[in-house]
Amino acid sequence: MAGTDSQRSAVYAAEDQWSAILDRGGIVDFFGSTLVVPTQRRFGDLQAARDYVQGVCAMIGVEAPVVRARRGHTRAHYESSTATIAIPDMESTGAWAGRESVVLHEIAHHWTFLTCGSLTHGRDFRSAMLTVVSETLGDQAALLLRAGYDGAVCG
């Protein structure tokens, strides 16, 4: 990624915590209020993730990126030069790569790059991610993520 990405670790920490909540789904006590959040999807193969990306991008009104398998096993990433989301092979990496939160994160990178030209995890990325989450998982899931970002001091 070009430029300084000073918020990367904080965003990852907030999203990891949020993703763990989505793994369980259901009722969440949020500062005395009851929220109901969905259980995140887990895609069993690359085609299922591709289909999901197509649907989400249609929903938010952006052209869908290519989705391809990635050789490495440690992370997914977005390639701006080819508008490609690269996801580790779900069969060999286990379930983490096929989690909905991972795919939404990469969709947010795609959207942010198309609209702002940015690849960092700054304010524009977080705004895109919150919009994508609100549209796909609902406002309560987005509220939890926003609180995670705020708690991780993503200014």
Residue positions per predicted region:
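Active-site-proximal or metal-binding-adjacent scaffold patches in catalytic folds
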Residues: 1-101, 110-155
